[in-house]
């Protein structure tokens, strides 16, 4: 084998036939550098991946799973706890609708004897007005207080005061039709005294004259007569003026009533009732002795003479 054949370069790839030997060498060197750089990159990426996997603790995955499950369970328990709090929490303030809650109606089983009842009375044509009201008071057993009236009447008999001082009153019979201007009075059923019943009327004539007085005879209605009145069940008969003894008795009775009311409200016993009776007897004998036992509110409402108030000094305790 000659020297020429021994000096030939090693075999080469067919894809490098078009390259110059110098360029071929550079191309091979570049490929080697690229392959070496690719190996380095692969090694670096693998090292980073291993380092990252090493940095991540497996326990963290389990704890993270637990943490992820814990909020869910916490949400459920929180929801349950919230529901329990909503059920067991005591409401504060006024209940809804309690302010506007309808109150039960007040039912009065019977009327009070001292209550006033209003009446509108219509007297038919041709009837006696005074007689009709008197019969109504007697049958209903109620006192009647006439407030006003309107309509027309005929053939009126009234009593007028004397025009001359000291002279007797005169009775006047009025014939014809008269318009009622004013009507007032009261009617009490028996056994009330007759003086407690009476009717006063003022009339206007056809020519403009005005006449009035106390009705002492028939008062015939000329057409419907409407009367506005009030009725009552009880009436206390008082004789005025009051005497001094009566005033003292009424004062003692008022104090005794206040004491009775306080004892009744406090649930007094029979012993308290006897004590109150003894106090009433003592008050009747010596009116000045009850001053020391009165509270200030009663002292303000009771009017006493000077000698009764300053009669005896307050005893020392």
Swiss-Prot record:
<dbReference type="InterPro" id="IPR005175">
    <property type="entry name" value="PPC_dom"/>
</dbReference>
<feature type="DNA-binding region" description="A.T hook">
    <location>
        <begin position="89"/>
        <end position="101"/>
    </location>
</feature>
<keyword id="KW-0804">Transcription</keyword>
<protein>
    <recommendedName>
        <fullName>AT-hook motif nuclear-localized protein 22</fullName>
    </recommendedName>
</protein>
<feature type="compositionally biased region" description="Low complexity">
    <location>
        <begin position="26"/>
        <end position="35"/>
    </location>
</feature>
<comment type="function">
    <text>Transcription factor that specifically binds AT-rich DNA sequences related to the nuclear matrix attachment regions (MARs). Binds an AT-rich DNA sequences in the FLOWERING LOCUS T (FT) promoter. Acts redundantly with AHL18, AHL27 and AHL29 in the regulation of flowering and regulation of the hypocotyl elongation. Plays a role in both photo- and skotomorphogenesis. Acts as a chromatin remodeling factor that modifies the architecture of FLOWERING LOCUS T (FT) chromatin by modulating both H3 acetylation and methylation leading to the regulation of FT expression during flowering induction.</text>
</comment>
<feature type="region of interest" description="Disordered">
    <location>
        <begin position="258"/>
        <end position="285"/>
    </location>
</feature>
<keyword id="KW-0287">Flowering</keyword>
<feature type="region of interest" description="Disordered">
    <location>
        <begin position="48"/>
        <end position="106"/>
    </location>
</feature>
<keyword id="KW-0539">Nucleus</keyword>
<dbReference type="GO" id="GO:0005634">
    <property type="term" value="C:nucleus"/>
</dbReference>
<comment type="subunit">
    <text>Homodimer. Interacts with HDA1/HDA19, HDA6 and HDA9.</text>
</comment>
<dbReference type="GO" id="GO:0009908">
    <property type="term" value="P:flower development"/>
</dbReference>
<dbReference type="Pfam" id="PF03479">
    <property type="entry name" value="PCC"/>
</dbReference>
<keyword id="KW-0805">Transcription regulation</keyword>
<dbReference type="GO" id="GO:0009647">
    <property type="term" value="P:skotomorphogenesis"/>
</dbReference>
<feature type="domain" description="PPC">
    <location>
        <begin position="113"/>
        <end position="253"/>
    </location>
</feature>
<feature type="region of interest" description="Disordered">
    <location>
        <begin position="22"/>
        <end position="41"/>
    </location>
</feature>
<feature type="compositionally biased region" description="Low complexity">
    <location>
        <begin position="270"/>
        <end position="282"/>
    </location>
</feature>
<dbReference type="GO" id="GO:0009640">
    <property type="term" value="P:photomorphogenesis"/>
</dbReference>
<dbReference type="GO" id="GO:0010228">
    <property type="term" value="P:vegetative to reproductive phase transition of meristem"/>
</dbReference>
<dbReference type="InterPro" id="IPR014476">
    <property type="entry name" value="AHL15-29"/>
</dbReference>
<dbReference type="GO" id="GO:0003680">
    <property type="term" value="F:minor groove of adenine-thymine-rich DNA binding"/>
</dbReference>
<keyword id="KW-0238">DNA-binding</keyword>
<feature type="compositionally biased region" description="Basic and acidic residues">
    <location>
        <begin position="48"/>
        <end position="64"/>
    </location>
</feature>
<feature type="compositionally biased region" description="Gly residues">
    <location>
        <begin position="72"/>
        <end position="84"/>
    </location>
</feature>
<dbReference type="GO" id="GO:0042826">
    <property type="term" value="F:histone deacetylase binding"/>
</dbReference>
């Amino acid at each position: 084998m000659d020297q020429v054949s021994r000096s030939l370069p090693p075999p080469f790839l067919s894809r490098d036939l078009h390259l110059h030997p110098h360029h071929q060498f550079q191309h091979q060197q570049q490929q080697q550098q690229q392959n070496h750089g690719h190996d380095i990159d692969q090694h670096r990426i693998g090292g980073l991946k291993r380092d990252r996997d090493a940095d991540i603790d497996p326990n963290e995955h389990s704890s993270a799973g637990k943490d992820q499950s814990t909020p869910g369970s916490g949400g459920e328990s929180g929801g349950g706890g919230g529901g329990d709090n909503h059920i067991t929490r005591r409401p504060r303030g006024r209940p809804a609708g309690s302010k506007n809650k309808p109150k039960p109606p007040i039912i009065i089983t019977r009327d009070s004897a001292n209550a006033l009842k209003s009446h509108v009375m219509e007297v038919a044509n041709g009837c006696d007005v005074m007689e009709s009201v008197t019969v109504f008071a007697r049958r209903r057993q109620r006192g009647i207080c006439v407030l006003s009236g309107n309509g027309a009447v005929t053939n009126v008999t009234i009593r007028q005061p004397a025009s001359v001082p000291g002279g007797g009153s005169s009775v006047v019979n009025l014939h014809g039709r008269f318009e009622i201007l004013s009507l007032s009075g009261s009617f009490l059923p028996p056994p009330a005294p007759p003086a407690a019943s009476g009717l006063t009327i003022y009339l206007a004539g056809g020519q403009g004259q005005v006449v009035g007085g106390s009705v002492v005879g028939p008062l015939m209605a000329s057409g419907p007569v409407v009367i506005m009145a009030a009725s009552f069940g009880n009436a206390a008969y008082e004789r005025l003026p009051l005497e001094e003894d009566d005033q003292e008795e009424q004062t003692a009775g008022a104090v005794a009533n206040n004491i009775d009311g306080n004892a009744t409200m406090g649930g007094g016993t029979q012993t308290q009732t006897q004590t109150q009776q003894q106090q009433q007897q003592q008050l009747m004998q010596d009116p000045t002795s009850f001053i020391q036992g009165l509270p200030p509110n009663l002292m303000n409402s009771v009017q006493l003479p000077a000698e009764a108030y300053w009669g005896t000094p307050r005893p020392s305790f």
